[in-house]
Every structure is written in structure tokens, then in C-alpha cells.
Amino acid sequence: MHIPSRQTEKQEAFLYNYDMIGNQMVNAGALHQMLKPYKAHLITGHTHYNLNVVFDENLMEHNTAAVCGTWWKADICLDGTPRGYGIYEVNDNDVKWYYKSSGYPKEHQFRSYPVGASKEHPSDIIANVWNWDKLWKVEWLEDGQLMGNMTRYTGLDPYASVVCSDREKMVYTW
């Protein structure tokens, strides 16, 4: 599908909101109900960022970032994910996936930032792990030594903030 069914786990009734109408389906509840008896993965796009939503044990949505980055204006997407595409490997009921950044090897799965790089969390080391989902565990290692688990938060990627705030570069002529 192109437009995401929902961007949160919470199953709320559709509410007309002009700013959000392009990011959700009017009939997402009916679609999710129809898929309830099956183990299903929805693959969507449209938003130019990665977002995985686990609705329940049988239904997950993968909103995959764009191969065009920020509408061909930058090599990254709005969430800091490099432009690229999703790879999905299906073997019977077993589904595995990862995000493949264009021009990088498969192993290129995150960007890290030192203390002070984030305005939102200036005293923290930040890792933007593209295609993350809530079933993953993200750990901080330094020189091969486990330093601890990282805490998830939703915020701005420092590099994407710089790139996307350049108004002259991001002007669209369409």
C-alpha cells in the first residue's frame, strides 16, 4: 500500500484532520479486522521516513523510507535515514526484514552522534537506528565493551535537522 494504515498502535476511529489525512487510511480499522485471522505484514510508504508499528502479535506495519530521500532534495529522509529501500525475506510464515541504504553495505543500519550533538538531549550519545521496531534491543558498545542499553525516544535526527532546515536547498518548484 502507499499510504500508511495507521502510525500508532492505538486503534482509534478515523478523525478528519487536514494535516494528517495523507498519513492514514479512513478504513484502517476495517482492514485490520479483515486481516485479524492471519499473520500479516503491511508494507507502506508515503511519509519519507521509517516507522514500524506492531499492532498485535499477528499484524505489523512497515512504513518504509523513500529511495528518493527527501524528494530528491537530499540523500536522507526526514528522519535521518539514508535514502534506500526495504528488503523483505519471506519463508512460509517467517518474515525477516532490514533497511538497505542506497550506496552503503547491508551493515549500515544506524548513525551515531556524540554528546552535545542533539539539542533535545545534549548530554546523551544518540543513535538513530533506521527501521527500528519495539521488539529490538539497542545496546551501546565502546571499544567492544558493553556500556549499557540505550533508551528509546522519538526526536529529531541532528544531521536531518541541519539538512532539512536549509530552506534554499529544500525549495520545491512543483
Positions of PLM-derived features:
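A composition-driven signal for long, intrinsically disordered, charge-rich low-complexity tracts
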Residues: 40, 127-129, 152
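Solvent-exposed serine/threonine-rich low-complexity stretches and specific carbohydrate-binding patches
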Residues: 146-171
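His/acidic metal-ligating clusters that form di-metal
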Residues: 1-62, 84, 123
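Intrinsically disordered, low-complexity regions enriched in small/polar residues
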Residues: 18-21, 25-29, 33, 51, ...
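Outer-membrane beta-barrel proteins
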Residues: 10, 108, 149-151
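Structural signature of outer-membrane beta-barrel domains
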Residues: 6, 104-105, 147
